[in-house]
Amino acid sequence: MVKVYTIASGKGGTGKTTVSVNLGTMLAQLGKETCLMDADIGMANVGLILGLQDVPVTLHEVLAGTAEISDAIYSGPAGLKVIPSGISLQGFQQADPEKIRDVMGELVKKFEFLLIDAPAGISRDGIVPLAVADEVILVVNPELSSIVDALKTKILTEVVGGHVLGCIINRVDQEKTDVITKKMEKVLSVPVIGIIPEDSNTRRASSAKTPIVIKYPVSPASLAIKQIASRLSGVALPEEKAPVAREGFVDRFTKVLFRKKA
């Protein structure tokens, strides 16, 4: 049975889209048929992150009624299927966000997991993704402004008939996780389903247009995202093996030298 999650945030800059991309990639790696749809039709970033910004058909054309959803599905990392939105203002103006309901009706027949990357903040375009998902996951930073805006998004979700599963706290100082978790659960009244630490490899992976769970699979952020994907899918993670360091020239030379002396 398909599970539809909308990934939302109360403000821009929380790392919501990066979380969506990596979570979708990890679900696909765990063997789940997964599709990530960029429903942020005004400020689309999924395509940019994955190098799909120049594809001929996007969600814009589908929502404008000039293309079929099957034409806007592209292959991403680890078998993840991706539906990017366009980056043109004209495409944004022609797209009807209400048609996302119809699009979902087609997608739920094809996948086990459908992730919807929603627009940040409270807007007309963001209401439908909050309402149509089985559950909404909030991406929050450990700052007061982000928490307050996430609370507004939670309230809006409930007003339009949606349900918030919980929140993912992103970019966290690892020494403060316990305090932040308690504060977040108290303010938002939802469980914390994952904590992603601040990780410099996130930016490096983004520059390479590659999800961090693939580029740096044992980095702190990757390990956190893998735990979240395991929790959502019910699939146990394979045991991580530490990378074996490659023997350098000096090491090889030293071995040969001492072998000869022996």
PLM feature spans:
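Walker A/P-loop phosphate-binding motif and the immediately C-terminal alpha-helix
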Residues: 3-40
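Residue-level signature of catalytic and energy-coupling elements of molecular machines
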Residues: 12, 17, 38, 62, ...
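Short, amphipathic alpha-helical "lid/cap" segments that border enzyme active or binding sites
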Residues: 21, 222-229
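Short beta-strand "acidic-cap" motif of Rossmann-like dinucleotide-binding folds
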Residues: 33-38, 45, 115, 139
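P-loop/Walker-type NTP enzyme "switch/lid" segment
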Residues: 37-109, 206-208, 214
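Conserved catalytic-core segment of NTP-binding enzymes
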Residues: 98, 102, 106-208
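C-terminal boundary of histidine-terminating zinc-finger modules
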Residues: 208-224
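P-loop NTP-binding site
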Residues: 227, 231-262
